């Protein structure tokens, strides 16, 4: 593949597609502001509306004056970036170079996604409204499923919407859930339609697995965390020294917890 035939938009789109496929936390966040970023330091203003007042209706009285919408202005800053930069030698056969480029770009997308996941997870850990720790209850006290019910109840008490609640668990917890008959997995799809990417459903949560977690269970709703990402640059170049084609790219992103009550972290202890 010659540098003259490299089409940045095509490879950037392919990179972005593979990037999104590799995300777990990134796929569960609100992505409403993704098209508004282009460079490091860009800011996006997010209006977090206050609750609308609901009043009792009396047909014999006039309606109260309409209230002006109010809320807080939250700033999302694009403050995280990662790049790749690799070479492909001229000596490779033409077809091999195309295959090598495709494989290299897929791997670059995966590595960028891993970097973004760690960044999002760090943001979630910092901004979560509730952080607790404790052992998984004994079997006669509900076991793991009992813990999920406790997390559900905690969110209910904070009036977190029940719609689209997500639960992200470590790999070890997935194994325990699969042995619980109250856990609805893919084989029971006729009973409950699973959200895309979810391994199952329990206690009102769509459940996902992340290899980046070891002893934490994270509950959240998408509106609680905003994530914006942009493959800002995908460039081909010809290094002066050697007979190579070079490809480099830059990924920029920003993440913010905008509704802390919508994020709950339980750290499992022995």
Model-predicted regions and their roles:
Residues 8, 12-16, 20, 121, ...:
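Generic detector of well-ordered alpha-helical segments enriched in charged/polar residues
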Residues 2-31, 35-55, 67, 72-78, ...:
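Sequence/fold signature of self-assembling virion shell proteins
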Residues 49, 90, 171:
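Residues immediately flanking
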Residues 91-158, 265-270:
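Alpha-helical scaffold segments that mediate packing/assembly in large oligomeric complexes
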